[in-house]
Every structure is written in C-alpha cells, then in structure tokens.
Amino acid sequence: MPILQPKLMKQLMKFAIFGNTYQPKKSLHALRLFELLKKQGAEICMCREFYQFLTADLKMEVPVDALLEGNDFTADMVISIGGDGTFLKAARRVGRKQIPILGINTGRLGFLADVSPEEMEVTFEEIQAGRYSVEERSVLQLICNDRNLQESPYALNEIAVLKRDSSSMISIRTAINGAYLNTYQADGLVIATPTGSTAYSLSVGGPIIVPHSNTIAITPVAPHSLNVRPIVIRDDWEITLDVESRSHNFLVAIDGSSETCKETTQLTIRRADYSIKVVKRFNHIFFDTLRSKMMWGADGRR
C-alpha cells in the first residue's frame, strides 16, 4: 500500500458542495458544515439542486457565494455530504477535473463518505493545516459498439450488466483481451474496481480488494452453475461482453445509473485514462475502516 504524503493547501479555499435531496432530518448537518467553512473564510459554491432543497423545501438560510450549473466549475476541493451514492454523483460531476473529493457520511455504511458529522470540525482543522491525504482511485470506462450512452460512461464503483423485462437469465459471453473466458448464464455480471469491491460486487459474493491494487473484479449475479466463481484480473486488460436475452434487451448500470441496451450491443470495458482523487484524513487506514464497517471481530454476545 503506498505511503500518502499530506497535501499543503492555501489558507483560503474554494469548496464545491454536493448533497442528497431526500434526507431532511440529516440535512441539519449541512448547516454545521457551512458554519465551519465560513469560520475559516472559505468560499462556498453549491450545486443548485441541493441549494434549492435546503432553501425552498427545508426553509434554511444557506450562505453560498455561487451556485453550480452542470459540470463546468472549479474548486480547490469538492465536499459530498450524504452517503456513498451522493459521493458517486459528485465524482461524476467532477469527472476529469482532478479536484479532490471529501465525503461526509450522513448515510448508512459509507466506505467513500467515511467522515462522520462528529468528525467534521477536526477534519476541516486538519485540512486547513494541510494534514490530509489524497488517494488516486481507478475508474472504468464503458464503450458500446453501436450507440452513445445517455449517461456518463465512467464508473468509480462498478459497471453491471443485468437482465430486464424477463425473469429468465441472460447469457453473457465474456472475453479478456480477445481471449474467451466464459459464457455466464446468470441474472447479470458485475465488473468492479477496487473501490467498488465493497459495494454491489460484495453483495453478490465478490472479493474485497484493497485500494491501489490495480485490478478489476468480475462477479456473476446468481449464476446458474455453482462452479462459477468471481475472478480478479489486471486493470490494464480489456473486457468484452456479448449478451443474449429472451427479451432481446438488457440493462446496463453504471454506478447506479441505468439504461437499456439491445442484445446486439457489444460492450467493451477498460480502465479509464483518468482517476478520481479521494480525500482521506491523514491517519486513515483502510483496514481500520474495513474492520469497523464490516463489524469484523464484533461479538454480539457481550
């Protein structure tokens, strides 16, 4: 695991804030966040959807300097306040900008958004002092042979191919760098980064992969054969998928955003040519987070 050096930032920073719009009670943490940032003299920008949710729906007074429209914005750091889903949406908006993203967890599990509301004050003191780390997380790219996707073709967590409009399984012919691997008879197939290995991939039996492992996990969803198991490959290898379905279509989900493809569509999945920068507290250790979130060693008898 690489040793990450602290990043020294200027005293006055510009923060771009993204949040979810369906947790009214937990949105009170946003007020504390604004208070901390203004105390540091920071410039606050906010996505318009979150701003309207706080001001129009919750009647909050929000001290913002500018509203963000679309994906055309600049900032020293992006703050995602919500769960991992909110973090993924923020990462999609950041795209290739290489702006580091800090996740404040007001959701449930939170592997990406792992700073608790109780840790906000000390975390921003550390950021002000330059005592934090930035981790580079790999991204997957999806290419279709016959169409352009309506959503972004990039995934920080995973790309999933799933059945649609039928209870019958789909058939997914899978090749790695042109070499035939297997034809999966299953409800779907999940292609995950190390970051995504603790998300959907884990729930369907995929392996937990340490960040910076430079790998991709391929895990079937409810396979027909008990002999089929997940496989981990290098992330500089290319995956090609050809799908057959009784409904003649299938679903592609990219970090939770989905759309329908025809079974004539061939999918190519490869590592993207950019990464997402994730802000972590300087004393952050992945294994501590893993042990805590997965409750390893917890004894319910006590």
From Swiss-Prot:
Catalysed reactions, semicolon-separated: NAD(+) + ATP = ADP + NADP(+) + H(+)
Keywords assigned: ATP-binding, Cytoplasm, Kinase, NAD, NADP, Nucleotide-binding, Transferase
GO cellular component, one term: cytoplasm
Taxonomic superkingdom: Bacteria
Localization in the cell: Cytoplasm
GO molecular function: ATP binding; metal ion binding; NAD binding; NAD+ kinase activity
SUPFAM superfamilies in UniProt: NAD kinase/diacylglycerol kinase-like (SSF111331)
GO BP, sorted A to Z: NAD metabolic process; NADP biosynthetic process
Cofactor: a divalent metal cation
Record: active site: 84 (proton acceptor)
Binding residue positions for NAD(+): 84-85, 89, 157-158, 187, 198-203, 222
EC category name: transferase
Family, as annotated: Belongs to the NAD kinase family.
Name this protein carries in UniProt: NAD kinase
Native species: Bacteroides thetaiotaomicron (strain ATCC 29148 / DSM 2079 / JCM 5827 / CCUG 10774 / NCTC 10582 / VPI-5482 / E50)
